[in-house]
Amino acid sequence: GLRKGLEVICAFDDTTPKLTQSELAQRLDLSRAAARRYLMTLCALGYMASDGKAFWLTPKVMRLGHSYLASARLPRTVMPVLQTLTNTIGESTNLAVLEDADAVYIGRVSAPKLLSTLIEPGTRLPAHTSAAGRLLLSYLPTDDLERWLTRTPLGAYTPFTVTDKDTLRRELTKVRKQGFCVTEGQYELGLRGVAVPLLDSTGSAVGAILGAVLVGLID
């Protein structure tokens, strides 16, 4: 029950912020009765709302992410580093991890400026379009990377997004050799990202520190 309830929550995203009972049932391969049961339970708990036809998530869902951020060791350990880096470069900095097809941002220190990139904790970006995502992909063992490439479609978000898997392989090899990643215009035109790895004692990347700026704002 808990697993399926979480799957229901994850079925809602930026492309489908609202779903009907039938649409959810089809998406998760549920009966309409089961879909309704999960939806009504989540509504009763305050995690979902409905207009009688469509359903959508409420802000209460953010508490789940806040609970993770409050309890997870990695964000708490790295936040002082992000603060120092932001103070030094005058730009917002972020902490990201790799989850399935996405780079997930789990920590941020904002620069004291009016205009800044809108990457908040909980933001997910396709890993192949993100400096942090590419950096983390480059540190995957070869077999794991090949499995990732096999199962993950490389969608185009701008005219410059790399969607060819052989091209991405070459880019990732370059990133691994140089130890950092720079992207520009891969997910959003004018957005430039620079990422470096957080390595554990075995040399594996457990996260990435990212600075992202709008190119037109750089002096």
Question: Where in the sequence are the language-model features?
Answer:
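Short helix-to-loop capping/linker segments positioned immediately adjacent to catalytic or ligand/cofactor-binding
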Residues: T84-L85, T93-N94, G155-T161, K177-E184
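Hydrophobic/basic alpha-helical segments enriched in Actinobacteria
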Residues: T15-Q21, Q26, S92, S110-L115, ...
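Extended hydrophobic
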Residues: D164-D219
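Amphipathic alpha-helical regulatory segments at dimerization interfaces
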Residues: R27, Y38, T77-T88, Y139, ...
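N-terminal helix-turn-helix
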Residues: G1-R76
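Short loop/turn microsegments at loop-to-beta-strand junctions
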Residues: G52, T93, R124, R170-E171, ...
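Amphipathic alpha-helical effector-binding/dimerization core
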Residues: A54-T152
